[in-house]
C-alpha cells in the first residue's frame, strides 16, 4: 500500500474512533491533521465533510437498528441540510481562510469548555411550537441554519441543533444527537457537491476523502466497542485531551501559516 494512502487510512480510523467513542464530528480531528500535512483550510474542510458521508451513514444505520432514530424528523432536518449546505462552497470561496480557521478554533474551544465544565442544555418543558406543520418547518429551518455553518466549517451539526430543537420543540439531546447524525448524510452530500461546483476541492481531495471516509467506518465500530469497556472518568479525560490537542494544532497552523 502507498504510504500516502496508508496515512489516510490511519487518519480515517482515528477520526472514526473519535466519532464512535466521543460522538464528536470528524472535523475536530481531521481538520487540524490535514492542516499539519500541508493541506489548505478549504481542502481540509472538504475532506472532513466527505468523511462525514461515510461515518454518518454507518452511524445512522446503527441508531435506526437500536430504534434511536426518528426517520420522519430526520428527513425534514435533512431537507434543510440539503438547502443550507448548498451555500457552503460559496462561503468557503469568498470568506478569508484565516477568519474561517479562527471561527473553527472558537467552536472547538467552546466544545472543550462545554465538556470541561459539564455544561448541559436544558430542554424546554413548555416548547412554544405545538403544530405539526410548524414543528416540521422548525426542523427544516434548523437544518438550513446548521447546514450553512456546520458544513462550511467541517463539523457535525449537534452543537447547533441541540439547543435550537431543545427550546422550540422540547427535544432531549438523546433524541437530537441521532437526528443530527442522520442530517449530516444529506448536508455532507450537498456540501461536497457545492465545494465541487465552486472549485473549492479537486479530484485529489475527493480521493483522499474517500480513503479517510471508508476507513472511518471501521473506526466508528471500534469507537463504539471502546466506549463499552471504558470508565466515565477515562472517557472524559480522553475527550478533553482530544479537544485540547485539536486546539493546539489548529492554533499552531494558524500562527505559522
State the predicted function of each range.
Residues 20, 33, 43-46, 164:
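Residue-level recognition of specific faces of alpha-helices
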Residues 22-30, 154-164:
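Transmembrane helix boundary and interhelical junction motifs in multipass membrane proteins
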Residues 27, 31, 47-50, 54, ...:
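Alpha-helical transmembrane segments of polytopic integral membrane proteins
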Residues 169, 186-197:
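Alpha-helix capping/termination and helix-coil
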Residues 16, 45-53, 82, 177-188, ...:
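Transmembrane helix-bundle signature of multi-pass membrane transporters/permeases
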Amino acid at each position: 500500500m502507498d504510504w500516502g494512502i496508508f496515512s489516510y487510512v490511519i487518519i480515517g480510523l482515528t477520526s472514526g474512533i473519535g466519532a464512535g467513542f466521543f460522538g464528536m464530528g470528524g472535523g475536530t480531528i481531521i481538520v487540524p491533521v490535514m492542516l499539519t500535512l500541508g493541506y489548505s483550510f478549504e481542502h481540509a474542510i472538504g475532506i472532513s465533510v466527505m468523511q462525514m458521508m461515510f461515518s454518518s451513514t454507518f452511524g445512522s444505520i446503527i441508531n435506526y437498528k437500536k430504534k434511536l432514530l426518528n426517520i420522519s424528523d430526520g428527513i425534514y432536518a435533512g431537507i434543510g441540510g440539503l438547502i443550507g449546505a448548498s451555500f457552503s462552497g460559496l462561503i468557503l470561496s469568498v470568506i478569508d481562510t484565516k477568519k474561517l480557521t479562527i471561527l473553527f478554533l472558537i467552536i472547538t474551544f467552546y466544545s472543550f469548555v462545554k465538556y470541561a465544565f459539564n455544561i448541559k442544555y436544558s430542554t424546554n418543558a413548555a416548547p412554544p411550537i405545538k403544530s405539526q406543520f410548524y414543528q416540521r418547518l422548525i426542523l427544516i429551518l434548523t437544518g438550513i441554519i446548521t447546514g450553512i455553518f456546520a458544513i462550511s466549517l467541517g463539523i457535525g451539526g449537534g452543537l447547533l441543533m441541540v439547543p435550537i430543537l431543545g427550546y422550540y420543540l422540547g427535544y432531549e439531546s438523546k433524541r437530537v444527537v441521532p437526528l443530527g447524525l442522520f442530517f449530516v448524510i444529506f448536508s455532507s452530500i450537498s456540501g461536497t457537491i457545492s465545494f465541487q461546483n465552486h472549485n473549492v476541492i479537486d479530484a485529489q481531495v475527493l480521493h483522499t476523502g474517500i480513503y479517510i471516509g471508508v476507513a472511518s467506518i471501521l473506526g466508528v465500530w471500534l469507537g463504539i466497542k471502546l466506549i463499552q469497556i471504558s470508565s466515565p472518568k477515562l472517557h472524559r479525560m480522553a475527550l478533553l485531551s482530544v479537544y485540547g490537542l485539536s486546539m493546539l494544532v489548529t492554533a499552531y497552523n494558524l500562527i505559522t501559516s
